[in-house]
Amino acid sequence: MNSYYTEENHGPFELINIGPLPLEEGRCMPECLLAVAVHGALNADKSNAILVPTWYSGTSKAMEQIYIGEGRALDPSKYCIIVVNQIGNGLSSSASNTGGSLAGPGFANVRIGDDVSAQHTLLTEYFGIESLALVVGGSMGAQQTYEWAVRYPDFVKRAAAIAGTARNSEHDFLFTEILIEAITTDPAFQAGLYRSSSAVAAGLERHAKLWTLMGWSPEFFRTGRHKALGFESMQMFVDGFMKRYFAPMDPNNLLTMAWKWQRGDVSRHTGGDLAKALGRIKAKTYVMPISHDQFFTVDDCLSEQKMIPNSEFRPLRSIDGHLGLFGTDAQMLDQLDAHLAELLSSPAY
């Protein structure tokens, strides 16, 4: 068990066993544990539920700190905000906390659809929820948001996809492959049988450097945004922020999420026809790319938005790029809150 993945660092959360989970790749998890953090309470008819899935490396604590609060669009005094940690992130069932044949490198290949299926079971059987006022997520959370809206069109009343696409691009697939190789080519990785996460420090450091290169935009560094965050040089930013962020994480967990991220694609439901898949969506949908995102570009997001009925394109302006999702740009968060508040006040489908 990796001591990083504890309530002390990421809590509080509740571990909920939803039972066996058949996976799209053919295996079955004998029991699937979902780490869930709830903010606010359900109203009498349970019509105020909002689902927030997590992104690559992120946990429910980050979602709470960055996006949830009284006076914000995601206001726990008005809504019951249910944050579900994705499978493989270290809090929910993952390579680092599962025994038997699923331990470590034996952990199953999990798809975005498996997360959404598990979340649907959680919401319907544990919470007794029959619809969601909103599903909102960033990056891999956006991938899950799209999967929800396509797979369960009558369940989702509103959807907000932030900095993510419904079908991953070939360019992004390749970049994620390089993230994977940064870890797996470390000799200490030992095919996933490393003695501890810290033993794979060199691989995790390379992984962090790649995230620095693509996660933040060139403009972020050229204009000195890293200095505004307290780092006098790019190297200090890499060492003091990015390497420090990823260093305690379990490599096998990161690989589980990266494999899943690469294969996000709602068109699996329609034989590869993306327009047909997105045409299923009934939810009032806001598509919100980040202007300087190098992973999920504005153009990629716009081309998908045009295929979604009852959708609007609401790009977020931030030179921070994809990792503006970390909440480093207060003006971007203001834009996001305004869009989400507008979406929540609009009629459902």
UniProtKB/Swiss-Prot annotation:
Belongs to the AB hydrolase superfamily. Acetyl esterase family. Its EC number is 3.1.1.113. Residues 67-300 form the AB hydrolase-1 domain. The keyword S-adenosyl-L-methionine does not apply. Keywords: Hydrolase. It is an enzyme of class 3 (hydrolase). This is Ethyl acetate hydrolase. SUPFAM superfamilies: alpha/beta-Hydrolases. The gene is mekB. GO terms for biological process: biosynthetic process. It comes from the Bacteria. The active site is at S139, D293, H322. The keyword Hydrolase applies. It comes from Pseudomonas veronii. Disruption phenotype: Inactivation of the gene abolishes growth on 2-butanone and 2-hexanol. Mutant accumulates ethyl acetate. One of its GO terms (molecular function) is hydrolase activity.
